[in-house]
Amino acid sequence: MRILVAFDKFKDALSAREACQIAASEVGRHRPDWQIETAPLADGGDGFSDTLTGVLDGEFHTAKVMDPRRNKVEARFGLVPVQNIPLAARKLLNWSSEIEKVAIIEMAESSGIALTPIEGRSPWDVTTAGLGELVKVAQKKGAHGAIIGLGGSATHDLALGALWKLGYRFHDKNGNEIDEAPVPRIWPQISKISLPRCELPSSFEMRLACDVDNPLLGSRGGAAIFGPQKGLTEDRFQELESETERLANLLVATAGAHAALPDDEGAGAAGGAAFGLKAGLGGRILSGYNLVKAWIGLDEKFSQADWVITGEGLFDESSLHGKGPGTLSLEAIDKGKRLSVMAGSIGRIPECPIPQSSISQISPPNLPLPQALKLTEQNLRRAIGKKFALSD
């Protein structure tokens, strides 16, 4: 039996690589004669930079930048020559010929939800300013472009914080510049956006690797789907939604040449960061899952597997809209492979195309979240053991 173990992260508990290693070791313990391949699914969130840079033996750099709450954090990014990127991935990225070296930047390193305490999370006063600082450092280190993994974010600021650090300015109704990070809390004060001078050369290119395909606004938009996990309360949803639409229109009015639209697939990723970086800096949105798949040769591993084991911290409807575990699960079903999806918790999935018998929640249903997070490794080992000690 040939097994492919391909997990995404269990947020606040295990990285994708750790989850894969744990699951593979448990399967191997129960089925020592099986062939096991691992493929961590860093589709834009945690582990994105480490995975892509590490595969190519690229350079790693660190920089002290602003975290979501405007404290300092040491963030890591990678640098790789374009010629070293696998051909299938280069075709997806479609760089201009003058782009010779690119940075691989993980938004979660500077603006990730893991950098904020679970208690008291709120989208109103957190910023992506550190992401902009990280891009600036990477460019000074020799990057001609950047692949930005948009996932695992704490923010819903349309990447306006990043744009602020890269030259954009925000003004009140009297034309006065607002000299602080443009977090949603101060959005009502913003009447105009300007770009007196961009901190990046005009030749600098961005690719925005998203782990979801949600639009910016509406019932499937960034605030509606991902706001609650960032601390957005139901009574303030409409307030944030309305201001998101207004600020998006202001940004497009300033930098309309890049033709970003709120309905663009993936525009709602990372609190609208995909929209903001596309509108403000001409970034191109692409599937993080497809990019990583091409980068690490997942297609070959998948084609050889008889059984696919995948999962993440929360498996819900959004998992089936661009995230690695959901996409891989649908591909496994399509190809008639055996499938096991294991998640910390299972959310609502209307008309789920995956058989319920293939999905299992590793945590006991009534276990409080803090305790469940601490026991994630133990629960994953137990779930794998239960499944494969009894399977045919």
Please state what every model-predicted region is.
Residues 1-150, 154-392:
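N-terminal loops that bind phosphate or other acidic moieties
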